Amino acid sequence: MSAVAENIQTEMPAPFVFTDSAASKVAELIAEEGNPDLKLRVFVQGGGCSGFQYGFTFDEITNEDDTTMTKNGVSLLIDAMSYQYLVGAEIDYKDDLEGAQFVIKNPNASSSCGCGSSFSV
């Protein structure tokens, strides 16, 4: 008797969503800076009225423990500590009557503050 192993490939869902709108805005900001090596780093840190808050910065360096997602030629970086809080989140950019800003829709957040800049899990 011989056992035949069946090679089944399943498509894993992305750990987070980086929208076209967010990628386009990041590309625009990188072009303004004139440094094509920049990547958007999204992170979670302690603070805010709900316990944690989101942060955004540009970075030229990809660390060994970073998770990287590339969309429309733009790279998004999330460090290992922040990753656990952002799994399943959508990183978007909104420009509406309330203003223009990057927005994170996070299914892991059990509550958030009124301004939406901090959350708890």
UniProtKB/Swiss-Prot annotation:
GO terms for molecular function: 2 iron, 2 sulfur cluster binding; 4 iron, 4 sulfur cluster binding; iron ion binding. Iron-sulfur cluster binds at residues 49, 113, 115. SUPFAM superfamilies: HesB-like domain (SSF89360). Its cofactor is iron-sulfur cluster. It comes from the Bacteria. Binds 1 iron-sulfur cluster per subunit. Keywords: Iron, Iron-sulfur, Metal-binding. PROSITE patterns: HESB. Pfam families: Fe-S_biosyn (PF01521). GO terms for biological process: iron-sulfur cluster assembly. Required for insertion of 4Fe-4S clusters. NCBIfam families: iron-sulfur cluster assembly accessory protein, PRK13623.1. Homodimer. Belongs to the HesB/IscA family. This is Putative iron-sulfur cluster insertion protein ErpA 1. It comes from Polaromonas naphthalenivorans (strain CJ2). The gene is erpA1.
